[in-house]
Amino acid sequence: MQRITLTRPDDWHLHLRDGEQLATVLPHTATVFGRAIIMPNLKPPVTTVDQAAAYRERILAALPAGAHFEPLMTLYLTDNTPPAEIEKAAASGFVHAVKLYPAGATTNSDAGVTDLARCEETLAAMAERGLPLCVHGEVTRDEVDIFDREAHFIDEVLDPLVQRHSRLRVVFEHITTQAAVDYLRQAPDRVGATLTVQHLMANRNHMLVGGVRPHYYCLPILKRERDRQALVEAATSGHPRFFLGTDSAPHPKGAKESACGCAGVYSAHAALPFYAEIFEAAGALDRLEGFASHHGADFYGLPRNRDSVTLERAATPIPEAFPMGDDTLVPFRAGGEVAWRVV
């Protein structure tokens, strides 16, 4: 197969940042994807509907000419988010989810939730109003090994949460383990999961063997090869609760290549071609449209996009870096190739 045409896809987990970074990365997504769930972990975080509205306007103002892209905004959950803010979010028409960052779990998560018990009334309001909770699924206790954080989160936080709030819709974002796949398969229909390019294409050996490769460093961290294989099987299975979420996360090159580098992989420059490569290798190109264009919209209760995009099988070079303000942005598979391109 040399060409495939899909319903225009959506990205259900995206970091756009702000300012010069926003201006650099937004065109990569907006020219291919119809919509994206926009992460709220700015500095300061987007914790109110008014802040989300202002951020949305900055995104719309930065769109390239001719782009028809809708940013789906989120709120950053804190220990003190009031139920009234959830009511306002649900009525806004542009806030589509609330994001749970356990405090200290990833980039700009210091203001995150320290104890989910403090959020029970807020979570109940979300369940009542049908506003999904997107979760970064890791515990952050010092005694838990970084490679085990996700499994602990399932047992200690996610499953009890799902059982306590029987109507709450939950998106288990950027899953990385066989344990997460197994959990999703037996979870209620109101629990979905996103899968990233890097977790489907790479394991921890890519990051650590033969030298540390900081541009593979992300959170949740890359896992074992058997976990990667389980993720590929899940993504390509056609299961309706696994869907595309890149977690594309830009950082300046200098912030990645340092003694204490930032977590995040930038994949938006070729996200859909990367997923096509993954699905082709699995013999499942016929299921790419469901994963990329249908499942996420269906889970969020939004209409599927009405237009389409076409991919062509053609080896396409990837730049070593993109200019970004006074620094540069190193993309996933920098200096290499991807087997598909959007035409």
UniProtKB/Swiss-Prot annotation:
Cofactor stoichiometry and binding remark: Binds 2 Zn(2+) ions per subunit.
Residues that bear N6-carboxylysine: K99
Active site (catalytic residues): D247
GO process annotations (BP): 'de novo' pyrimidine nucleobase biosynthetic process; 'de novo' UMP biosynthetic process
The keyword Metal-binding belongs to this UniProt entry's keyword annotation: yes
Keywords: Hydrolase, Metal-binding, Pyrimidine biosynthesis, Zinc
Chain positions recorded as Zn(2+) 2 binding sites: K99, H136, H174
Requisite cofactors: Zn(2+)
GO MF annotations in UniProt: dihydroorotase activity; zinc ion binding
GO CC, alphabetical: cytosol
Entries under InterPro entries matching the protein: Amidohydro-rel, DHOdimr, Dihydroorotase_CS, Metal_Hydrolase
A Pfam family per the record: Amidohydro_1
Enzyme type, top EC level: hydrolase
Binding site for substrate: H15, L16, R17, N41, H136, L219, H251, A263
Keyword Coiled coil: no
Residues given in the record as Zn(2+) 1 binding sites: H13, H15, K99, D247
EC number(s) stated in the UniProt entry for this protein: 3.5.2.3
Pathway(s) per entry: Pyrimidine metabolism; UMP biosynthesis via de novo pathway; (S)-dihydroorotate from bicarbonate: step 3/3
UniProt family annotation: Belongs to the metallo-dependent hydrolases superfamily. DHOase family. Class II DHOase subfamily.
Quaternary structure and partners: Homodimer.
Function: Catalyzes the reversible cyclization of carbamoyl aspartate to dihydroorotate.
Protein name: Dihydroorotase
The species this protein was found in: Alkalilimnicola ehrlichii (strain ATCC BAA-1101 / DSM 17681 / MLHE-1)
Taxonomic lineage: Bacteria, Pseudomonadati, Pseudomonadota, Gammaproteobacteria, Chromatiales
